[in-house]
Amino acid sequence: MKRSSKFTVALLVVIAALAVIYRVMNSAPSDKLAQSAQVLEIFKDGGCLSCHTDNPELPFYAKFPVAGDIIKVDIDSGYRAFDMTPIMTALENQQSINPVDLAKTEKVMLDKRMPPAKYYLAHWGSTTTDAKKDIIMNWVKDERIKLYADELAEDRAAEPVRPIAQRVNVDIRKAILGNFLYHDKRLSKDNTISCASCHGLNTGGVDNKQYSEGVDGKLGGVNAPTVYNAVYNFVQFWDGRAKTLADQAAGPPLNPIEMASESFDQIIAKLQKDKNLVKAFNEIYPDGITQNNITNAIEEFERTLITPNAPFDKYLRGDDKAISEEALNGYNLFKKYDCATCHVGPNLGGQSYELMGLRKHYFADRGMELTEEDNGRYKETKQERDRHRFKVPGLRNVALTWPYYHDGTRATLEEAVRDMGIYQSGVTLNDNETKQIVAFLNTLTGEHEGKTLTNDNKQ
């Protein structure tokens, strides 16, 4: 046999051997493992923890000059976009998975983004094969079905967006009292401002101002989020400083820029002069009018402020005629361009903190001086990763809640959508795509107390 022929045969043998090794190294986890254990194994073998954590598992070549610089860029980018520590912890402890983590994982699988080629070429066992992808996608669907007790059409059971519930369980007596307190201006220092002043129920749960006016005309530094469907948020306020609706209700009355009361003792002293109100409290709360009881009643009322039966909810439940073809195309674009990796669940948001300017520096382009409010979650944690990171706003009734963003700088949905594409998704939407996504967002306006929500303010 000629030398060249021997070389060719040897080369083919080596290639065949490498192919076998590659297939073995990239085989899917055993189906004898629990579903969560299979997913955990795929994540670990895929090298997810090499980038998506604050304590990455670095390969040996990370110490080399050029390779080390490349790896650092990848780690910084990966960790900014997705911290996988919570999802790994949840899998290891058989806990519920955050819906945003599910959505991000699903999108990565659909787009076959991870791991990047430069990683799996050096780590043969990290490739995401079709078998691994199927395991992940089935797990995402099963987790969503477990997470949400809703009724979706069978072919929509795995959608990242869910319908608003028809009702929530509340203590009706507390809710009625909370409704009264929500509109009571005595919670403010000079009896001029109530919760409804900035979160009007007849104006989409907001005031449609860039910054709300408090006592003496003082302006806040952040755009007022809607009160509708706030019960679905995992925390309250843009910076997440309130864990519950009751915690949130305790903030504005004592905020010197908002309602400016000196203390709840001052508020209680005023309310105790109202004999009917004292009686109402005593009938519900044995200890009468207290700070905790005031905020508890407001919380119970705000739990009733849900807006079910939006056209898109009807579509999710199986009514194909509930939305237009244009709106459906918009929803598909909404998913294609990663919007549905953060705007998930019944409220299409409110489930995570995300970086404003993930793909392009928003604040550098904005042309306004940075404020303390622009620091977002960093205000509370003082962790650098949280700078410019905000609670994702819910998109329910978004057509009624202009202006947009935490700084209220976008007056229309068209502006907000186009710029989200640039700064969060890294895409430039054309006019038709923008129009379609806006059409989808318009299908998210729901009903309150049996009537379609409207806004008395005119844009």
What are the language-model segments listed below?
Residues P65, A103, V108, K243, ...:
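Alpha-helix N-cap/helix-start motif at coil-to-helix transitions, marked by capping-box chemistry
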Residues L40, G68, K72, L102, ...:
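Extracytoplasmic/secreted envelope proteins and their assembly/folding machinery
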Residues L33-G47:
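Short extracytoplasmic/periplasmic juxtamembrane "stem" segments immediately C-terminal to an N-terminal membrane anchor
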Residues G47, H52-N55, I75, M109-R113, ...:
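Sec/Tat-exported extracytoplasmic proteins
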